[in-house]
Amino acid sequence: MAQTHSFNGRKRVRKFFGKIPEVAEMPNLIEVQKASYDQFLMVEEPSGGRPDEGLQAVFKSVFPIQDFSGASMLEFVRYEFDPPKFDVDECRQRDLTYSAPLKVTLRLIVFDIDEDTGAKSIKDIKEQDVYMGDMPLMTDNGTFIVNGTERVIVSQMHRSPGVFFDHDKGKTHSSGKLLFAARVIPYRGSWLDIEFDSKDIVYARIDRRRKLPATTLLMALGMDGEEILSTFYKTVTYTRDGDNWRIPYSAERFKGMKIISDLVDADTGEVVLEAGKKLTARAAKQLAEKGLKAIKATEDDLFGSYLAEDVVNYATGEIYLEAGDEIDEKVLKTLIDTGETEINVLDIDHVNIGAYIRNTLAVDKNESRQEALFDIYRVMRPGEPPTMDSAEAMFHSLFFDSERYDLSAVGRVKMNMRLDLDAEDTVRVLRKEDILAVVKMLVELRDGRGEIDDIDNLGNRRVRSVGELMENQYRVGLLRMERAIKERMSSIEIDTVMPQDLINAKPAAAAVREFFGSSQLSQFMDQTNPLSEITHKRRLSALGPGGLTRERAGFEVRDVHPTHYGRICPIETPEGPNIGLINSLATFARVNKYGFIESPYRKVVDGKVTNDVVYLSAMEEAKHSVAQVNVELDEQGGFVDEFVICRHAGEVMMAPRENVDLMDVSPKQLVSVAAALIPFLENDDANRALMGSNMQRQAVPLVRAEAPFVGTGMEPIVARDSGAAIAARRGGIVDQVDATRIVIRATEELDPSKSGVDIYRLQKFQRSNQSTCINQRPLVRVGDRIHKGDIIADGPSTDLGDLALGRNVLVAFMPWNGYNYEDSILLSEKIVSDDVFTSIHIEEFEVAARDTKLGPEEITRDIPNVSEEALKNLDEAGIVYIGAEVHPGDILVGKITPKGESPMTPEEKLLRAIFGEKASDVRDTSMRMPPGTYGTVVEVRVFNRHGVEKDERAMAIEREEIERLAKDRDDEQAILDRNVYGRLVDMIDGKVAAAGPKGFKKGTTITRELMTEYPRSQWWQFAVEDEKLQGELEALRSQYDDSKKLLEARFMDKVEKVQRGDEMPPGVMKMVKVFVAVKRKIQPGDKMAGRHGNKGVVSRILPVEDMPFLEDGTHADIVLNPLGVPSRMNVGQILETHLGWACAGMGKKIGELLDVYRKTANIEPLRQTLEHIYPDNDRNEPVRSYDDDAILMLANQVKRGVSIATPVFDGAVEADINAMLTDAGLATSGQSTLYDGRTGEPFDRQVTMGYIYMLKLHHLVDDKIHARSIGPYSLVTQQPLGGKAQFGGQRFGEMEVWALEAYGAAYTLQEMLTVKSDDVAGRTKVYEAIVRGDDTFEAGIPESFNVLVKEMRSLGLNVELDDTREAEQPALPDAAE
């Protein structure tokens, strides 16, 4: 045993079953959010040298702003942020937004314009810092605090800018003909569509308006007919040769053609190929090699072809024929008459090259650029008369003006790639060449060359993260502001103003506020547990502004695409209308600078797999062959098999090993975080895995978290990256620990400018967004040595730094008296009594005292007509005590509101006269506990408006807070003193003194003992002869003084914030928040689930003695129905049960060996067993090098059950499970004989029994159960409201009415439709009747009938009720009978 490893017991040790080594580090799971927003704000960058992206780019794109006359200009210089006013916790408590003030330096330049020459000269330059509103900051965990609540900005998937080619799949035209179309999508600006119609004419549309012939667009670009044709077609020259014509021969043009008439050499007259034969490519090439230069053509060959250029009489300028005209006899005669000996025709054969553009030109009525521009102008702005200037300006602004049109760097890169162009990615507008290239490519597609694009390919979809969404929003705000600035610059005397006077930052600030407050992508963070937080931050939504809508999204967009592999999880997506539109990022994926999702791959060089990792987007990956991660490799990293399964361009195929150039990094890389937490995922059906990954996000944090026996190795990563467990920022020694904070004296990364002390505040019983409880517990003890990144405190749902969403429970798979029919769950009472599935929920109640028209509301204990009993929990200020147990209807905060004056009765006057004023002019509006909620008050916060006198309770809370701050300051000061004075002693111990405190002899050697005789404050008076050392001493002293000052200043600042009044909404004088904690034990009706999508509702809680038990008397905790497994195909739960059983068996064995050690002090058997469990490899803990103390600590940790990790797609196989069961001394069948707890008889068959990890989900029966007595009614229909929140009733719908009709239950039906619902008079009568003890009543007219009548009257149909009874109607005459 060469080197001993100490094991500190602060982390969970897992036995790893994975066989594939991890090559790449998994990126931080919330990097997506943090990197994006950092790139937008660029706080760290020096303000002078920021690159043009993010906020800098927005300012650069809007500024400089010139006024309308050009006499002045406002330029942007730089921006910077002041430190935020309040820190994250203060913002949470005070309902504020965590943000930093944005200061922008602007420069106003005023010009002198010479009236004669128009020359400009600078007259004046002014610079000024302008406050431009607050910019929200991101917390360390990738969230935003907006008005006191944590929000997440979800990343959006949208179609990447660029050009896309597609066809209608034959749906438009009845013949099923494919109509091709191209679309140029910019990042912002007008869309350009170019499409074929059923007659093969090419049309262009701008912004989905009316279509125009594509040639109109080309003419507007400055081309004429001849130029258009010469761009799209080659020409063939027919030369007059006696009576015949000759055309040049080219092998390219003639290959593959069937020869209709003999092919005759024009020079020799010999027939080189007879009619009816096919000219193969080889034969065509041979003819050229033999020297065939030209062939004969007849006039018939000319007919049907098109002229390539205009035929003009240059003397008169008369145009005889135009380019594109079809040649017929008449045209040919004209040509021969004009004496043409050469005719250039377009090379169109209607097979490989169609005449689409020529036909479009023929259809197009526009002849010139002006007509084309006018035509476009009319389409874009119907009803306005065009002029050349306005039409030209409008056309230019559509695609060629960088203010209005932006392809973005991504769009330009995509366009260059698709069209083989080479424009710089700074060219963000369209060019003439781009439009021509698009039309050319479209025509080629129609001719059968090339492929259309797949818009669901991840190469054509990109991610917009927080930074980019925010950038777009801020640009909108600045543009609104720009208009106002321009107007103000023109209307004001510009010489006398400063930049501050021109700027009104409200629109910019409003745009930011609007985005964070009400954008569809700014969501209330799902904070149920750490996993739900992380998943929310990694979510990708195709919905939102500029995205899809649920109704319009078809099946294709939602479906899994081959390019999702390693980028988007194919499993985790919601069930229901959003399926496939909301996705989750895969574990190893990251987003590149262009917004495309990249996945990591290992490079394969010369058939050997290297550890060199490259990240590739879907576009780049398409060119490679990628091998799976579980391919068999030899020692040198070469492929064992001749042929390897690999993916290439979306297809899975067998490829020779020489062709493989990449390999996956990890088997986890194709799934998301939540799916990677499911052990044996490979054995579950995908539908159930989807439910499993979604339900883990709904698991409620339990009072005692317990990590799963059977994990996947992802647990510590999630706990760390979510920020639930606290990791040490730098190494050091623990100095102090209590439940609320940990103080660590740093020993690594010591920086003179920073404090040498790290204080970690722990969150205690805080309420999360979902009312679950956030509570952190320290894991360290005083004196522990900590390394950077060690977990020092556990949070909600974490256990020793591992994610722990549920509990390990002993499960038996068997039916039990029908109590687990249809996925019901039978539980043991022991689970309730041991608080296994108990959770704490914290509800927040808020009450505000406002200033009303009749006078201010008052928070007080003095409430009219309330018994002393009801006030027993309130203090003298009328606010409930902390620790009070409250029940439904109890008063939490007493509040009275002034009542309107009403005329007094004589009795009231008398009472007033006797007892003084205050009798009845206030009413009780106290805050009471809602029905069905019980709990304990855990926290009270009181907020007062500036200048409002604070009550006793507010003062007490304030004093407590200041004491806590003072304690923090004193502790930090004490550690600082200890550090600094310790260093001082080390520096001067044994040195010769040059001076010292009073009474000290110069020249004496300083020793530690000597120094202790003087008080610490005098130690600074020692001076040494060594000048260099003396300089260091002085530096230490000044640093110490600075640190002290900083500490005091920080303390004073915080105290000032505590004492200052709070910002309140208008009209609110005082606000009280009461937090009530509720302990929820598990009960029938609660929903539970495993990790494999096996969910159910608790049906009964059985006494322990009735539960089935094993031979040794161990009772099952939970009984599940075995029929829930086969049809659902989530066999993973059975494998987990077996492996969990083996884990517990091994744990029991270790417990027994621990007892042996305690009796005999022989540790060897224990050591050998642990070394057998954790074999020596790079994935397992180095147990062989543990010392005895570490072995005992480990044994104590695993005696309840050995934790193991079985990573997805690389986990334990059947043989591993069997081996582990055998090691634990259990049957390899995984089944045991069970005995019936009620009779003690054994069951007939052996039963599968083992440990399974069960979660309690956030669907608690307490939150759902609800019964209405008399409650609120809807104003219009007078029917009871619906839903628990409104204390509503149960809807009696159309179908329920049919049921009563079918039974003939006429009276019940009448009651349902009248007195129990909306017959206003009737229901009061019923109440009165019941009170009298009389049970007769009459139904009247339902209010909804009156609503119907009113609606009909609004349509002009008068409906009146006829009140006459049938009895009064006259009898009909006999004839009518």
Curated annotation (Swiss-Prot):
The keyword Nucleotidyltransferase applies. InterPro entries: DNA-dir_RNA_pol_bsu_ext_1_sf (IPR042107), DNA-dir_RNA_pol_bsu_external_1 (IPR019462), DNA-dir_RNA_pol_su2 (IPR015712), DNA-dir_RNAP_su2_dom (IPR007120), DNA-dir_RNAP_su2_hyb_sf (IPR037033), RNA_pol_bsu_bac (IPR010243), RNA_pol_bsu_CS (IPR007121), RNA_pol_bsu_protrusion (IPR007644). It is an enzyme of class 2 (transferase). Gene3D superfamilies: 2.40.50.100, 2.40.50.150, 3.90.1100.10, DNA-directed RNA polymerase, beta subunit, external 1 domain, DNA-directed RNA polymerase, subunit 2, domain 6, RNA polymerase alpha subunit dimerisation domain, RNA polymerase Rpb2, domain 2. It holds the Pfam family RNA_pol_Rpb2_1. One of its GO terms (molecular function) is ribonucleoside binding. Its EC number is 2.7.7.6. It catalyses: RNA(n) + a ribonucleoside 5'-triphosphate = RNA(n+1) + diphosphate. The keyword Chloroplast does not apply. Keywords: DNA-directed RNA polymerase, Nucleotidyltransferase, Transcription, Transferase. GO terms for biological process: DNA-templated transcription. GO terms for cellular component: DNA-directed RNA polymerase complex. Belongs to the RNA polymerase beta chain family. DNA-dependent RNA polymerase catalyzes the transcription of DNA into RNA using the four ribonucleoside triphosphates as substrates. The RNAP catalytic core consists of 2 alpha, 1 beta, 1 beta' and 1 omega subunit. When a sigma factor is associated with the core the holoenzyme is formed, which can initiate transcription. NCBIfam families: PRK00405.1, rpoB. This is DNA-directed RNA polymerase subunit beta. It comes from Brucella melitensis biotype 2 (strain ATCC 23457). The gene is rpoB.
